[in-house]
Every structure is written in C-alpha cells, then in structure tokens.
From Swiss-Prot:
UniProt family annotation: Belongs to the peptidase S1 family.
Domain Peptidase S1: 1-20
Organism annotation: Paralithodes camtschaticus (Red king crab)
Listed name of the protein: Collagenolytic protease 28 kDa
Catalytic activities: Hydrolysis of proteins, with broad specificity for peptide bonds. Native collagen is cleaved about 75% of the length of the molecule from the N-terminus. Low activity on small molecule substrates of both trypsin and chymotrypsin
C-alpha cells in the first residue's frame, strides 16, 4: 500500500515511503 506519511514503517524518515 502506497503511503505518503513521514517515518512510516519500512520507509525512510522524512520522505514518502511504502507501508509494508
């Protein structure tokens, strides 16, 4: 699931990451 939150699980802080 594509997420646009910061410091989301499985993603880089401050950037748009993916929810895995």
């Amino acid at each position: 699931i594509v997420g646009g939150q910061e410091a989301s699980p499985g993603s880089w802080p401050x950037q748009v990451g993916l929810f895995f």
